[in-house]
């Protein structure tokens, strides 16, 4: 599929004895119109990368009501199962995934699939790596200010102190957090300072067209999901005092929940897949 773009990042860490490869995707916004052919092409691209781990950083669903469409959900579950046959898959939740409390039921069931891990303020670790997934609350995204709320983010981190303090020092640590827009703020950086890498999505690459994406080297976008123009932290790689943030451009740039007319413009934007190689000591 010509419209798939593999974005490569090479990092390094003394905590790893060998190189590891991550595939990082997000913002699939799966709905009634999502093509199974598109999902198959994405699977083939992931398979070709030979990842050790696969990360999906939120908005797997466009609207939770899709879970009532048994035929479409069966196809999605089958696709996730096929990814689990490639490598372990870790999913964090985004604002489109968790509109109602009952929306968690679908994601809880996904944990029954072999090699699928939904990290809802939870963690996973093996001999090489520690992974956590944070779920930002509804009032983080939707509030009277109509912008993302730093206090709600800090409260989430404080309430999940076991995911931000006394983490295994010798393991490479990755956090999955759907929205990156406040992850470079000083108080947030201090809370997350034990991590090496934070993976995010949500920003849809700031809706920067592909040609401008190659020219403009900063992390600003044209517009953010909370309707800010020229918002920061919308794309690319960001270095903070302690960790690196990598933001995926997203599988879908314009979802059907915006408008059906706008969603037809998706063909103008690439399907973004991040391939991240972390070089270890050899």
Feature annotation, model-predicted:
Residues 113-114, 127-177, 183-190, 258-270:
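Binuclear metal-dependent hydrolase catalytic cores centered on His/Asp/Glu-rich metal-binding motifs
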Residues 24-39, 61-72, 98-102, 139-151, ...:
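Acidic/histidine-rich helix-loop elements
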Residues 24-26, 53-59, 88-95, 117-121, ...:
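Active-site neighborhood of phospho(di)ester-bond hydrolases with catalytic His/Asp-centered motifs
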Residues 1-33:
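Acidic, histidine-bearing metal-coordination/catalytic regions of metal-dependent phosphoesterases
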Residues 34-126:
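Core catalytic region of metal-dependent phosphoesterases/phosphodiesterases
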Residues 12-23, 123-136, 168-174, 239-245, ...:
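Beta-strand-turn-beta hairpins that frame and shape the catalytic cleft
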Residues 49, 80-86, 167-169, 188-194, ...:
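Short, conserved loop/helix-junction motifs that constitute active-site signature segments
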Residues 180-272:
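Conserved beta-sheet core of the metallophosphoesterase superfamily
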